[in-house]
Amino acid sequence: MIKFVFNGYYRSGTTIFYKILNESNPSYLCLYEPLSPHLFEALTNPEKIVLHLHGFHPYKCYRHLNSQNLDEFQRIHKDICQKFKNYGDNIPIHLSEVVELFDFLNNLEKDTIIQPNRCHFILSQLAQRYRCTFIHIIRNPIDVWIGQTLEPLVLVGNVKRAKLVYKFKNTFIGRYVLTKYLPNREWVNGFAINENFKLIRVFNLDYPDSLDLLDKMLIVWTYCNYYAFKQADNERGMVVYYEEVTREPEKWFRIMTEFSGVNFDLKYAKILKPRITKDEKLRKHFVERLERLGLIDMVNEFYPPKRWFG
């Protein structure tokens, strides 16, 4: 039975919280990204990027399913991937698109915690159908962008130039790489920015495909977080902010434990290390992009830029 969903946009802290939830709730089945199109490939042959980026193998949780359940789950998962094949990522706009998968997980014998990453638009539907709670985490877009671009090069590729840029990201050259160079490099698309941008266009957005990757990421970041924010009624769903939680983890662990009904063990609070790029020039650049894209009013509603650095 699904008891709790912890969701967030890519590189917002969801994986470290999956690890915390998994270790804090040993009697629960904690499942990582069940909608990931790469799930079964990663389960059988974990990529170097997964192991190095996260420091552990998050997909091995599916080995707790017996062979019959795993086979059935794989069948359902394959059907969903086929349904979303034109988008390249499995992000549902309506629960009906993935309800067979979540019904299956809800019918498992063990109480279950899910970290899906891709449920921004259906959180309230999940909470209503399965009588579960959800928390959606939001991180400032500067560090989300850095997490999707520079950090993989540093942690996985061990690229010396990337390490230098990461170290000096608050300098002129660092800002140039982040805001001018990387947005125009297609190989940066490691976190499905183009694919998610294509899917977001179901909202009848008239943004051109010619936008650079940073613009596209900001559009996706805004829509995913805005719609999740609007579904959080503080009864079954709530929103937390990476910068606040990592600054005062013990306070927020208590709040999230009380709200969710599952445990955020205080002994794991110490493993949260806030990584916040406090740079006014970068904030100004990101705000200018959001204004040009017509997104700033939405962003001001769910995470005003003045709060980005905690």
UniProtKB/Swiss-Prot annotation:
<dbReference type="InterPro" id="IPR027417">
    <property type="entry name" value="P-loop_NTPase"/>
</dbReference>
<protein>
    <recommendedName>
        <fullName>Uncharacterized protein AF_0600</fullName>
    </recommendedName>
</protein>
